[in-house]
Design a protein with these regions (language model features):
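Short, well-ordered beta-to-alpha junction loops that form the rim of enzyme active sites
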Residues: 120, 179-185, 261-264
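Short N-terminal or domain-adjacent regulatory/targeting segments
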Residues: 1-30
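Hydrophobic, aromatic-enriched interface-forming segments
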Residues: 153-205
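Histidine-centered active-site loop/cap adjacent to the catalytic His
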Residues: 270-303
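Short hydrophobic segments within beta-strands
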Residues: 35-36, 180
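Surface-exposed cleft-lining segments at the edges of enzyme active sites
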Residues: 138-159, 164, 223-232
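Substrate-gating cap/lid alpha-helix
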Residues: 188-256
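Conserved SGNH/GDSL esterase-like catalytic core that processes O-acyl groups on lipids
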Residues: 31-33, 39-150
Length: 303
């Protein structure tokens, strides 16, 4: 069983944590709580979090940041989850009160060194995006982005983030919380191809997943793929400027919330598996950036 899969099981985490405690190794081993969406959980390939949990052979020799003493990861991420509560699927919201309360039970029971988040991308695509742009036509990217802004979606997502951050910061004020931006997609309209290599026999029932953006913009935004890329770029910049950055600057969080800006890293179509997910190599590149920032947040004895 892959390390990342094993550590996603709560019982496995508990057993491994207690084992490290019995061996007096917790003072050297960073312990992370991870909640997120498909950038932390997609089975299409090694994802962003997989590469942080299980670095590639040779990474250290190439100068990729490493945890000095390894790490223990409590993983509860799920592909498709939203940040803000959803009326149609309340159980798929990471920052809903029930989920926050559940995770707080673990967060206060074990000595975590950091919280890692991947949240917000799904809140702006798929059926929501279709509804937001319904009735619009012949828009340019700037006009389409203003439609998104007018829905109040950024405020909803920021409020959901804030609810999670305040709950966790109140519970343990000294624990850093690290999120990330998304990179700018290239292959707008491309579905995720599923196969035996990434999904096993489940792929026999479903050959692809998505696309989540292309079908919702192709009849609304004029200009083809270049215009669609420009629109999505504006949405991702808006996520940083209207959600992540204001929360980072919120003094009531004591400077304990931060995010890794991953924008502008993967600039080639070949670095993307589909319109929302990088390839395994793309995620590996982004993970090196994320891991370096995470190490900076850890206690000196655990870096």
């Amino acid at each position: 069983m892959p390390i990342s899969s094993a550590l996603s099981q709560r019982g496995q985490f508990r057993a491994m944590y207690m084992g490290l405690k019995a061996q007096h190794r917790l003072d050297r081993t960073p312990v992370m709580l991870c909640e997120g969406d498909s950038w932390f959980s997609t089975p299409l390939s090694m994802n962003l979090l997989d590469w942080i949990v299980s670095p590639a052979p040779g990474d250290e020799e190439r100068g990729v940041p490493q945890f000095g003493q390894g790490g223990l990861f409590f993983r509860v991420e799920r592909s498709g989850d939203h940040a803000a509560p959803q009326g149609a699927a309340p159980g798929r919201a990471m920052f809903a009160k029930d989920n926050i309360d559940d995770l707080l039970g673990w967060f206060t029971r074990y000595d975590f060194d950091a919280v890692l988040l991947s949240a917000g991308g799904n809140d702006f695509v798929d059926t929501w995006l279709h509804g937001a742009l319904a009735g619009s036509a012949h828009l340019d990217p700037a006009e389409a982005f203003e439609v998104i802004v007018s829905t109040g979606r950024y405020e909803q997502v920021r409020t959901a983030y804030e609810m999670f951050l305040r709950a966790f910061h109140t519970a343990r004020p000294g624990v850093p919380i690290l999120a990330h931006s998304y990179d700018y997609p290239r292959r707008i309209g491309s579905a995720a191809e599923l196969g035996l290599g990434n999904l096993g026999v489940a792929a026999l029932l479903k050959k692809s997943e998505g696309p989540w953006i292309g079908p919702n913009v192709e009849g609304v935004i004029d200009g083809g793929i270049d215009a669609w890329r420009a629109f999505v770029r504006r949405m991702i910049d808006g996520f940083v400027e209207r959600v992540l950055e204001p929360l980072k600057r919120d003094s009531s969080l004591g400077g304990m919330f931060d995010y890794v800006d991953l924008r502008g890293q993967l600039t080639q179509d070949t670095q993307w598996n589909d319109e929302m997910h990088p390839t395994e190599a793309g995620f590996h590149q982004l993970a090196g950036i994320f891991r370096g920032r995470l190490i900076e947040k850890l206690p000196a004895t655990k870096r």
